[in-house]
């Protein structure tokens, strides 16, 4: 049998190759660790920047306006007026009067919805006050229900109280507020601004629908508001 003997020179070469492989493996592991460390660092940094950005947005949104725009155009200013103009344009796009002029049923439903919303708003405000004072609201509900029935609103009577079938929030306010909130969400975080925009929406809607009451037996929203206020005042004046 032939015995194979490695020469010292071959042994040295083999040892050098093994050492080289170990060094490369060590370098590779070290590089992988470095890459992982850098990656983790950037993830942590991005997380911190994101937190700071969110915090900045929340702080910024509490102001009455904010700035945005490119360097070339300067800084455009978003104000309450911009939001209100958008709401007015949205109302124009809905085209209540245009639709009413083409569809008598739509015009009638619009008038009923508007007056029912006036009824609901006054009922809720007065009832909350009377309840807080411990006063029975049944007589008040009966009287304003009778007033709603007398102006021609459809509805039902239960426990001697007439309730308009369309009682509830003004159906045209929600589309205006929702559209503006979707486009300018930062302007609706502040509750005071939310209330301001809602009042404005109600105002422009009432202006828009006013002509629909010119040629009908129903009172205008303003006239119906006055009727309900006079009824409410009779009960409120006796509150302690």
Swiss-Prot record:
Region (GEF catalytic domain): 78-240
GO molecular function term, any single one: guanyl-nucleotide exchange factor activity
Cellular component terms (Gene Ontology): extracellular region
InterPro entries, A to Z: SopE, SopE-like_GEF_dom_sf, SopE_GEF_dom, SopE_N_dom
GO biological process, alphabetically ordered: actin cytoskeleton organization
Gene3D superfamilies: SopE-like, GEF domain
Annotated localization: Secreted
Principal localisation: secreted
Keywords in alphabetical order: GTPase activation, Guanine-nucleotide releasing factor, Secreted, Virulence
Described purpose of this protein according to its UniProt entry: Activator for both CDC42 and RAC1 by directly engaging these Rho GTPases and acting as potent guanine nucleotide exchange factor (GEF). This activation results in actin cytoskeleton rearrangements and stimulates membrane ruffling, promoting bacterial entry into non-phagocytic cells.
NCBIfam families assigned to the protein according to its UniProt record, in alphabetical order: PRK15279.1, PRK15280.1
Protein family according to the UniProt entry: Belongs to the GEF (guanine exchange factor) SopE family.
Protein name: Guanine nucleotide exchange factor SopE
Lineage: Bacteria, Pseudomonadati, Pseudomonadota, Gammaproteobacteria, Enterobacterales
Gene: sopE
């Amino acid at each position: 049998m032939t015995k194979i003997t490695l020469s010292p020179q071959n042994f040295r070469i083999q040892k050098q190759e093994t050492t080289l492989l170990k060094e490369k493996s060590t370098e590779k592991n070290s590089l992988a660790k470095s890459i992982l460390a850098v990656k983790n660092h950037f993830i942590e940094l991005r997380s911190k920047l994101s937190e700071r950005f969110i915090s900045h947005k929340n702080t910024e949104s509490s102001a009455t306006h904010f700035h945005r725009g490119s360097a070339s155009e300067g800084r455009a200013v978003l104000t309450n007026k911009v939001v209100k103009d958008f709401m007015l344009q949205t109302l124009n796009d809905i085209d209540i009067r245009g639709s009413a002029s083409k569809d008598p049923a739509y015009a009638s439903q619009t008038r009923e919805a508007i007056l029912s919303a006036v009824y609901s708003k006054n009922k809720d405000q007065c009832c909350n006050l009377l309840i807080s004072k411990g006063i029975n609201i049944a007589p008040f509900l009966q009287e304003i229900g009778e007033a709603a029935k007398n102006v021609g609103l459809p509805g039902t009577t239960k426990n001697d109280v007439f309730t308009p079938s369309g009682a509830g929030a003004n159906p045209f306010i929600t589309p205006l507020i929702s559209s503006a909130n979707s486009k300018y969400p930062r302007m609706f975080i502040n509750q005071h601004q939310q209330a301001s925009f809602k009042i404005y929406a109600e105002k422009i809607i009432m202006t828009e629908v006013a002509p629909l009451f010119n040629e009908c037996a129903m009172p205008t929203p303003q006239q119906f508001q006055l009727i309900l206020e006079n009824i409410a005042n009779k009960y409120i004046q006796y509150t302690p």
